[in-house]
Amino acid sequence: MADQLTEDQISEFKEAFSLFDKDGDGCITTKELGTVMRSLGQNPTEAELQDMINEVDADGNGTIDFPEFLNLMARKMKDTDSEEELKEAFRVFDKDQNGFISAAELRHVMTNLGEKLTDEEVDEMIREADVDGDGQINYEEFVKVMMAK
């Protein structure tokens, strides 16, 4: 499954993996998964976190390593039921629920994920996605960016 990913995708997933793997030991624990999900405004129970880990934990050691993470991401990308997931992700970014992601909202989410971005980097991300040039990202623009990945 993961062998169908491009070099770019793999390096992006490596970056995402390291956001979860807070202590850098190469494994994502339920605690680390919980930290990231809570920073995104979710509130999973310990049992839900354990279920999520178990779902992808191929070797049964109770954590997710990078190959397992890659398989999960490859499966998610193939999953055509991504419309609902995209809406959910958009809502995470769109803090005030006005239908747009502003630079401030983007910065807020990225900071919560542990990504310290300069104003220039945030503006650049907005510009890349902002097709109609209004300085923010609407849902259609968000979908385009997410599907291009």
Swiss-Prot record:
N-acetylalanine modification sites? A2
SMART domains on file? EFh
InterPro entries (UniProt xref): CALM/Myosin/TropC-like, EF-hand-dom_pair, EF_Hand_1_Ca_BS, EF_hand_dom
Q: Where is the EF-hand domain?
A: 8-43, 44-79, 81-116, 117-149
Is Heme among the key words of this record?
Answer: no
Keyword Metal-binding (UniProt): yes
Q: Binding residues for Ca(2+) 3, per the UniProt record? A: D94, D96, N98, E105
| Keyword list, A-Z | Acetylation, Calcium, Metal-binding, Methylation, Repeat
Q: What does the entry list as the binding residues for Ca(2+) 1?
A: D21, D23, D25, C27, E32
Residues that, per the record, bind Ca(2+) 2: D57, D59, N61, T63, E68
Q: Name one GO molecular function term.
A: calcium ion binding
Enumerate the PROSITE patterns for this protein.
EF_HAND_1, EF_HAND_2
> Residue positions of the PTM N6,N6,N6-trimethyllysine?
K116
UniProt-annotated binding residues for Ca(2+) 4: D130, D132, D134, Q136, E141
- Segment forming the signal sequence: none
What's in the misc comment field? This protein has four functional calcium-binding sites.
Q: Which PANTHER family match?
A: CALMODULIN, MYOSIN LIGHT CHAIN 1, 3
The family this protein is said to belong to = Belongs to the calmodulin family.
Job of this protein: Calmodulin mediates the control of a large number of enzymes, ion channels and other proteins by Ca(2+). Among the enzymes to be stimulated by the calmodulin-Ca(2+) complex are a number of protein kinases and phosphatases.
Its protein name is: Calmodulin
